[in-house]
Amino acid sequence: MLISIEGNIATGKSTHFEYIKTLQLDKVYFVDEPVEEWRNIKDKNNMNALECFYNDKKNSFCFQVLAYITRLKKLIDIIKQYPNDIIMSERCIESDKYVFAKMLYESGDISSIEWETYNYWYNCFSEISKVDLIIYISTDPVECLKRVKSRNRNEETSIPLEYLEQCHNKHEEWLNSSSIPVIKIDGQQSIENIRLEINKIMQRLVEPNSLVASRTKPISTAI
């Protein structure tokens, strides 16, 4: 069963994803977002792929293809290794497409032929890494921007509030129209309250009689 942790940039995904790892639940395995892979690919000026994307939108298609390939490879590798267990990923290829790639296509940063090419690749492999449940951490874009500035990552210095607002809206649009079950968590609660919610969710998922014993559709909680 594949569960994806979703949310805007700086919504708290990575923090809570790392917390779930500390619970050391039996037969639960993790797929980190492939950020290090993106940072290891650099241009002739030593700018990594993520920096190139944020600094020049002409690199949009290139980066989205890289994000898709690196994420898909990690997912396929772990699904093959643990086909009957719970796999948790930080984002998925669905959010790559329906949030980030779609947003770039609608803004004109990805051309129509690039969008059609992306969709062809997506459709070829979407069934392999199909998500069974989404845990969505929803945080106001203004708060996300504060967190972006606070963590001060080189690649994110040029991210404006408008981009975070667009990301937020695209997440809401995607998840409200998706057939994938969604559990929504308010990302602006205290970290203690969020962890209490996560603990309850994870305990339900690992119960012996839970539907998650196989990769079938589990708990259905709409946002």
Say what each PLM segment does.
Residues 8:
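P-loop (Walker A) phosphate-binding loop of NTP-binding proteins
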Residues 145-223:
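NTP-dependent small-molecule kinase module
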Residues 22-65, 70:
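Conserved substrate/cofactor phosphate-moiety recognition/catalytic segment
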Residues 58-129:
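Glycine-rich phosphate-binding loop used to anchor ATP phosphates in small-molecule kinases
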Residues 5:
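Hydrophobic anchor at the beta1->P-loop junction of P-loop NTPases
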Residues 97-169:
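A glycine- and Lys/Arg-enriched "phosphate-lid" helix/loop adjacent to the NTP-binding pocket
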Residues 16, 20:
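Hydrophobic positions on the alpha1 helix immediately C-terminal to the Walker A/P-loop
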